[in-house]
């Protein structure tokens, strides 16, 4: 056999193995990422934030539900949910049952587009050349948005969609603000704009999609840390290189993890979650395992 056919067969076998790994192994390899952020006043106690995003849950996803149910064992001080919880209305009840152990933990949330309507079949390669939009929303299956909101609020969690809130945790005065989904141009930062209130120890921003305009506005207002999701970490990444897309105007190098947003007014930390799920029409991850994050906020040096 000549060299070229051998190489072709080897390439095909490698591609098939990579696809099988991404579709059947990595997409279910849920993990917890630990991140430290030095943003608290000197002498403060540490604060643990559990950042959950992009579950895209189907009711039949037993392993994902078991992982979610075990998150209470991380003992967070605050839960931040940055949206895209559901892929079908039938997933609402099992989701809330799995989250039930976090019922007594303070929490906040904002919604993403898939908390309003369900996903639709799409060509995943299209994300490499342009951002997905919301033109097809009218043809998508409605999600139980208000039931989801009410369920989170029954836990005592605060809806930050266009709202500000304050918490007292571990002796810290924490201010939070959030926006609706910028990917659908639903963000109206004017609803929450302005500097943190006097006496606030740490100010956090929460949004689903990390578009530059939202990150800039929050940074200009002096927020210490901004939490977002939406990107799936790129979902399909190149080993040694990283993400190819973020489905937003954020640089691919910032598709997941901690980075800084710089404006003329200053800088803010930004944490983008790679999320726990995928669209049910592209249930595949490669070099980008599904995750939640525990952010430990510590005193700044």
Segments and roles (model prediction):
Residues 1-11:
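Membrane-penetrating hydrophobic segments
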Residues 8, 15-98:
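N-terminal active-site segment of His-dependent metallophosphoesterases
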Residues 38-50, 157-158, 164-176, 198-202, ...:
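Beta-strand-turn-beta hairpins that frame and shape the catalytic cleft
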Residues 51-53, 78-84, 107-113, 160-162, ...:
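Active-site neighborhood of phospho(di)ester-bond hydrolases with catalytic His/Asp-centered motifs
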Residues 57-62, 86-90, 114-121, 140, ...:
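Active-site environment of divalent metal-dependent phosphoester hydrolases
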Residues 63-167:
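Core catalytic region of metal-dependent phosphoesterases/phosphodiesterases
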Residues 122-157, 161-163, 169-216, 282-285:
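Binuclear metal-dependent hydrolase catalytic cores centered on His/Asp/Glu-rich metal-binding motifs
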Residues 210-293:
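Conserved beta-sheet core of the metallophosphoesterase superfamily
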């Amino acid at each position: 056999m000549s060299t070229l056919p051998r190489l072709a067969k080897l390439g095909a076998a490698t591609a098939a193995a990579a696809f099988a790994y991404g579709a059947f192994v990595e997409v279910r390899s849920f993990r917890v990422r630990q991140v430290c952020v030095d943003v608290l006043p000197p002498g403060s106690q540490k604060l643990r934030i559990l950042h959950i995003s992009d579950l895209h849950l189907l009711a039949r996803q037993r392993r994902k539900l078991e992982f979610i149910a075990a998150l209470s064992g991380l003992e967070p001080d605050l839960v931040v949910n940055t949206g895209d919880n559901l892929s079908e209305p039938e997933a609402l009840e099992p989701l809330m049952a799995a989250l039930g152990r976090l019922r007594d933990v303070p929490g906040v949330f904002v919604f993403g587009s898939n908390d309003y309507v369900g996903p639709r079949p799409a060509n995943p390669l299209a994300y490499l050349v342009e951002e997905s939009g919301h033109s097809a929303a009218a043809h998508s299956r409605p999600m139980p948005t208000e039931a989801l909101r009410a369920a989170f609020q029954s836990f005592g969690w605060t809806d930050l969609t266009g709202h500000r809130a304050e918490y007292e945790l571990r002796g810290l005065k924490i201010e939070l603000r959030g926006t609706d989904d910028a990917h659908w141009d639903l963000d109206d930062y004017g609803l929450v704009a302005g500097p943190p209130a006097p006496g606030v120890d740490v100010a956090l921003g929460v949004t689903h999609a990390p578009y530059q305009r939202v990150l800039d506005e929050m940074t200009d207002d002096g927020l210490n840390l901004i939490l977002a999701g939406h990107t799936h970490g790129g979902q399909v990444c190149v080993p040694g290189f990283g993400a190819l897309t973020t489905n937003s105007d954020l640089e691919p190098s910032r598709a997941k993890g901690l980075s800084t947003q710089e404006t003329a007014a200053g800088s803010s930390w930004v944490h983008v979650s790679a999320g726990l799920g995928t669209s049910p029409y592209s249930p595949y991850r490669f070099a980008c395992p599904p995750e939640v994050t525990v952010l430990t906020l510590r005193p700044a040096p």
